[in-house]
UniProtKB/Swiss-Prot annotation:
EC class (word): lyase
UniProt function note: Guanylate cyclase involved in the production of the second messenger cGMP. Plays a role in dauer formation.
Tissue expression summary: Expressed in ASG sensory neurons.
Protein name: Receptor-type guanylate cyclase gcy-21
Cysteines engaged in disulfide bonds, as pairs: none
Keywords (A to Z) from UniProt: ATP-binding, Cell membrane, cGMP biosynthesis, Coiled coil, Glycoprotein, GTP-binding, Lyase, Membrane, Nucleotide-binding, Receptor, Signal, Transmembrane, Transmembrane helix
Extracellular membrane side: 18-490
PROSITE patterns named among the record's database cross-references: GUANYLATE_CYCLASE_1, GUANYLATE_CYCLASE_2, PROTEIN_KINASE_DOM
Amino acid sequence: MLSAVLLLLFFIQNVQNFDKIELEDITVYFPLKVDYLAPFGCATGTKCDDEGAAYIPSAMEIAINRLNADKDLEVFHDLDVNYVDTSKTAGPRAARTAALNNGTIAALGLMRDCYIQSTILNINSKIAVSDVCEMDLSSVKGFDQTSVLMNSQTNSLAKSVMYFLDKYQWKKVALVSPSTVLTAFATRVRSDLLDALTANKIDILVDSRLDPMSDITDKVKEDAEKARIFIICDWSSNANLLRNYLFKLGEMNKMQSGEYFVLGYISYDTNYQWLEASSGDQRLVHLGASDINDYNLTENDLHEVYKNVVILSDGPPPAEPNSTWEDIKSQVLMKKPAKMCPPYCNTTVSEKITPRWDRIKLLFDSIQYLADATNDALNIGANIYQSDIFYEYLISRKIDSVTGVTEFIDGYGAIVGSIQIYYHFSSSSHNSYSLFPCARLAQSSLLNTVWSLTDYSEGLSIDFVNKSAPKDTPVCGFYGENCGPPANNTFIIVISVGVAVLIGLAIAAAFLYKRYRYERRLHSLFFMIDRNQIILKKHTNLMSQQSLRSMASIHGSVVAASQTLRDSHFFIEDYNNASSINASSIFNTGSTARAGPFGPIPGFGGVTGASEDEKWHQIPDFGVGLYEGRTVALKRIYRSDVEFTRSIRLEIAKLQESVNSNVIEFVGMVVQSPDVFVVYELAQRGSLKDILDNDDMPLDDVFRSQMTKDIIAGLEYLHSSPIGCHGRLKSTNCLIDARWMVRLSSFGLRELRGEETWQQEDDVQEGKDQLWTSPELLRWSTGLSQCGVLLVQKSDVYSLAIVLYELFGRLGPWGDEPMEPREIVSLVKREALAGKKPFRPDMAVLKESPRIVQETVVAAWTEDPLNRPSLHQIKRKLKPLTIGLKRTIMDNMVSMIEKYTDKLEKDIAERNEELEGEKAKSEALLKMMLPEVVADSLKLGSNVSAESFENCTVFFSDCPGFVEMSATSKPIDIVQFLNDLYTVFDRIIDQFDVYKVETIADAYMVASGLPVPNGNHHAGEIASLGLALLKAVESFKIRHLPNEKVRLRIGMNSGPCVAGVVGLKMPRYCLFGDTVNTASRMESNGIPLRINCSGTAKEILDQLGGYEIEERGIVEMKGKGKQMTYFVRGENSDMRRERIIRERVKFASLKKAQIQEKTYEFS
């Protein structure tokens, strides 16, 4: 071993004379190769963010030249870089290309949002060293980690802020951050800061989230009365929020008093252009602005303001303290990106793009870091192409940065991070007054996690206005609570206040009394309803076609169902009325679709005799009850409890005062933790969406026109009421009452519902409730409660356009668009921002609709909210729809229901037959997914517990060469191949007493002896099945590779096993135990076109008799050690036939085993 290492060291020292190194298990070829993934195409004028990639090729060439000059790193000389343009190739596809490139040792670069890219690389065991990714490594679970992130961590800001708070003993602060432009990374940074402040018992007196471009004067004045120490986090460009807030404090003379201090943070990513400007640039003096003309401040005022301001940033260190870094920056500027081919071949790089020095610094550090780790690994003969081995050399390392500072990679593959500190002062070296980087906060070593300050050439020296740090609390407190009034003036003050109060009471007695009654009413929680006052009812939505079939089957005729439909679209009954309706027949129909009038859900079942608490807990989104003799609707709010603050009580008061024929009536609230419900009047005919989705419900122009008129009338009322807007307009929130009038619901309560914890939707349904939401609200990161009323009103106009599109097109809110809801929502949110045409529904759906409707829809969903028409303009535009119509909506509805009832009488019988047929299909499908005995237990409502089987046999097979076939074939060809092969297999296994467990890619798993035991016949059935499958693949043809043969490899093992149903959605019958693992090892260590058999299975086959078994020998298996293995070569079909006939009476499952007449033998 020692001689091998010495020989390896000799090779490495003389690598320039060799083109490869022979290691123990692999050959390393030189030069080494890496992939670099970045959106290079965005630097050529494309309207997308190049993420600093423009100068990467230039910097890479300089970095490689530096490595070539280092004789200690000869293994990394002449590094071969393959540039992958992610702007032309989707990020995941580019990552997959890099992952499958076996000739590279790592993938560099990646994207900011690199979760999918990193996951693909990790799954494929490819090292990733990213200098731009902003992913949280804690989110990576389920496979070995192979990623290293060189970008700053999200907790760097929190650690730097705590450094200053601890140093000056500040315990009370104000936190200010933008309400817009927050990326996922910025959100995590802010969250980590809040966690750190809370953990260190720092009182957050103010937490303001402001629009950087709005007038914040009043808010700054309000905040200044509540706090003295301000932490301002700004991710906007040109430090708009920090500058605006700070200069407003200056205009109020707060900063000049010396009693205030601002600790500001600006993102280098959005401010690097002016942060890297020369010292004479006015933007460095004015925090990103060229002048201060918009503020009532002078330059001398600014000098006083800046004394109590420290700026933090996540950028790179300055160039001046380090000559090497300064020289590299000069070389990068001289080497123009346009001359770098690849990747800029036959393209022109935009001249306006400036270098991103943070990205370039991280590139140099990444290359040097990867070179050092590779050299260390090869020095001891480690395999650098095996990620789990190589990754150990990449973590817990020190990095000597090109900027002259020391960085650290922790044990999780993430850089420890650092923060640059800026301060305004007059620099002697630059002979100017400006914002200069003066120090750096970071860890001093990998093990010492305490952050310390390191000064640059001109270090941090805070020149406080009052020569000392301000206190976090005024001497007398923020409200004078620490200081009493002067002793001599107490009597005068009391008399004066008393007289003033009496005069005020005399003048405003009537007003105060009215106000008192209003406030008393607010504090009395007048809207609260005792849960015991509501009698819960079962209900189902009869507009559901499945529910109609159930109703008809229960009542035995169409007349009963249609009569109920005339009066209401809900069937309601008492919980204890079990004789009239079988709950399982209506509510447990197997459908998971939701369609209630206040959101999804057709009703809830519940068990007769359940306690009152259980009944309330089982209510999903929507329920029905009886309150004070009237039927009411219960809308669940997804909060475990509610603190009725004054603002929430005011919301509820406005809601109760909203009385209009086109809005739903608010009745009250039921709050008994963990259940919170809003109680409304019940809209008897469900929602507009229920009607539109029912293909059997005929609609005419009168219906559509009247519905349109009602919706606009309801919106007009809300916009002019104290509530001000709707915010959640969609067809499911347009309810239909007994008189066929539209009543809008789910408006108001923006603050109460702003903290709802919504249930997670599945991937297909994710985003479906946002299909009506305007793009500006989709981009609004702080939720509906933080939006201005005017913005939400314009958003209501957009939502109205989608509802009209749905009403007149009757193909849903997005017509026949095939994409999933979440994909539609993503395109609506992002397409316009990327400079593309805004994504909207296909107007071809409305080609048969009136032109005025088409024109209104197009105008109302305009991207710019200010260009959308007002409700008054829309109402005037659509007025011709109702002119000349003499019949009322009720007359039309009565006629419509009569037609609908006649149609039902003809169709119900046919649908009953269809229902029976669908039931049979469902049972057949269930038995295809689960064993028949398990499926029968589930149909009876019984629980299926895990069961232990003393002896069974497990079968695994796969197709060697499948991975290579997948790499060289089209995906559709692979799917056709697997479908053809498994169709043959599935037909064959029907002839044996076996159960197919699952297929994964080319792997096929079968078991025998469970869930119905069959004695020792399980081993024989599996062996016979394997022989039949081997015979079948001899004649099997691969469609796209007709000259290739399937080389099936089979493994089998017998032993004890535990089996049971796992999961609630898409349940699977799964097997557990060492028997399964050993069977898998038999297959993976087997020989193609052979049945590889374990010793335990061989013993059972010997007992059964009739099988030809050949000893293979001892095989080393991972996790199992050395195992004796055998081949099953053939069988005597006569012995099997006699054995099965003899044992069928004893083991019923053998009855499905068909007896083969021919013996299969293989050489």
